[in-house]
Amino acid sequence: MTKDSPNKAHPNLALLAKLDLRDLDGSAALFSDDFVWHYFNPKLPDVAGDYVGIEGLKRFFSIIGAKTKGTFRVEPVSATPAGDELVVVHARDTLDIGGQAITLDVVVVWRFVEGKIKEAWDIPSAFTLAR
C-alpha cells in the first residue's frame, strides 16, 4: 500500500499494520479466540484446511516453513479495506520447494469483528507456480 493512500486511516488497516507474522505470540492480542485461517491450494493438498486460533496459525506457518526449508517470505503489495469487516491484501510470496524457486501472487482476505481479527482466507495463485 502506498503511503499516500486515502484508506490509510481505516481502523482495520491500522490493526493489520500491528500484525507481525514473525512474532505471532506478540501479535496474539490482535486475534479473536476463535480465529480461523482458511487455506486452499491444490498444489499443496496436505497443507489445505482450516487452522483454528493463534496456535493453529503458528502450526500453518510451521508447516509452510518446513516444506520450504525456511525460504518462505511474504512481501505485502497492497491492502484495501472493503466495508467495515474486510481488508483485501495482495502479497507476493517467494519460496523454494524441491529446489524450485517460486514467486507467486497471493490474496489474503482478512475479516475483523469487534476490533479483532476473526478470520482470514489465504488464496494463492496456485496455477501460476511455475515461473
Model feature map: region roles:
Residues 1-33, 131:
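Short, low-complexity N-terminal intrinsically disordered segments enriched in polar/charged residues
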Residues 2, 14, 44-47, 97:
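A general structural-boundary detector
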Residues 2-4, 58, 62-131:
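A beta-strand edge to alpha-helix "cap/lid" segment located at domain peripheries
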Residues 6-18, 38-41, 57-61, 116:
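Short charge-dense sequence patches
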Residues 8-9, 46, 92:
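A short, structure-level motif marking secondary-structure boundaries and short turns
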Residues 26, 32-83:
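A solvent-exposed, acidic/Ser-Thr-rich amphipathic alpha-helical stretch
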